[in-house]
A protein has these predicted regions:
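Conserved small/polar residues in nucleotide/adenosyl-binding loops
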Residues: 120
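Conserved mixed alpha/beta catalytic, RNA-binding, or beta-rich assembly cores of soluble enzyme
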Residues: 16, 20-29, 50-51, 62, ...
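Short, surface-exposed connector motifs at secondary-structure boundaries
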Residues: 8-10, 60-65
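N-terminal basic/disordered segments at the start of proteins
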Residues: 2-43
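N-terminal beta-loop-helix "entrance" segment that forms/cooperates
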Residues: 41-60
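Short, flexible, glycine/charge-rich loop motifs used to bind or transfer phosphoryl groups or to couple energy/partner
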Residues: 3-4, 57-58, 83-84
Length: 120
């Protein structure tokens, strides 16, 4: 777990449903004890948002070291697809199911520390 603290300094967590929001909240509480900086949290369960989700993901790819999606892997893959460029530069992308039982590293598993996050 110490490896996670050293490698991932900033990130964003995005959820799409009420169950995903509960899981994301629990996960972020656990991660906050291990990280130097807290993850940003975006709740996309409602209809009112300051930015379109595609724009948020684009900005996250440019600014964050890690993106956690709590929800369907298909949604995450479609959202990140336009921005994927290089395994050494892209942020770690992790998808966690809504119940919090399974974590799938999508990008930057070894290089970006995504595999380490998936074991928490």
């Amino acid at each position: 777990m110490e490896q996670l603290k050293l490698r991932v300094r900033n990130g964003i967590c995005i959820c799409f449903t009420a169950q995903g929001k509960e899981t994301a909240t629990r996960l972020l509480e656990k991660l906050s004890q291990q990280m130097e900086e807290a993850f940003d949290f975006l709740d996309y369960t409602g209809s009112e948002h300051s930015k379109p989700l595609k724009q948020v993901v684009k900005e996250a790819f440019q600014e964050k070291e890690a993106i956690l999606f709590v929800g369907a892997a298909g949604i995450a893959v479609r959202l990140i697809a336009p921005w994927v460029r290089d395994k050494l530069k892209d942020p770690a992308v992790l998808v966690i199911d809504e119940q919090g039982r399974y974590a799938i590293p999508i990008l930057s598993g070894h290089v970006g520390g995504c595999n380490a996050v998936s074991y928490t």
